[in-house]
Amino acid sequence: NTVSSFQDILMRMSKMQLGTSSEDLNGMITQLESLKLYRDSLGEAVMRVGDLHSLQSRNGKWREQLSQKFEEIRWLIEEVRHKLKITENSFEQITFMQALQLLLEVEQEIRTFSFQLI
């Protein structure tokens, strides 16, 4: 379940002490939370039949926003991969590997939801 995975990974990431890069880590946590909310809102839109019109009326630039979210995911994937390469702490390695897997799952879910909306 990606919801519990999100909560677990965010909690573990927030407990990490990466020295000077803690600002980077906080930024990653914030972006992960933002992506989770976006994924959830797309999922809700898909569950409501014909909600594409509602989505378009609330957010005329939803396709542009979707593209931006995919860029954010790709950037986060690169950041997580970089952190994974430089850390030697096994707890951090496991956490970043799970975060990477979660990002790939979320990317796939957002892609699936967006195809259902088009």
From Swiss-Prot:
Keywords: Host nucleus, Host-virus interaction, Transport, Virion. One of its GO terms (biological process) is exit of virus from host cell nucleus through nuclear pore. Its main location: virion. The keyword Transport applies. The keyword Transport applies. InterPro entries: Flu_NS2. It comes from the Viruses. It is found in: Virion; Host nucleus. Pfam families: Flu_NS2 (PF00601). One of its GO terms (cellular component) is host cell nucleus. A motif (Nuclear export signal) lies at residues 9-18, 82-91. Average number present in a viral particle is estimated to be 130-200 molecules. Belongs to the influenza viruses NEP family. Binds M1 protein. May interact with human nucleoporin RAB/HRB and exportin XPO1/CRM1. Mediates the nuclear export of encapsidated genomic RNAs (ribonucleoproteins, RNPs). Acts as an adapter between viral RNPs complexes and the nuclear export machinery of the cell. Possesses no intrinsic RNA-binding activity, but includes a C-terminal M1-binding domain. This domain is believed to allow recognition of RNPs to which the M1 protein is bound. This is Nuclear export protein. It comes from Influenza A virus (strain A/Chicken/Japan/1924 H7N7). The gene is NS.
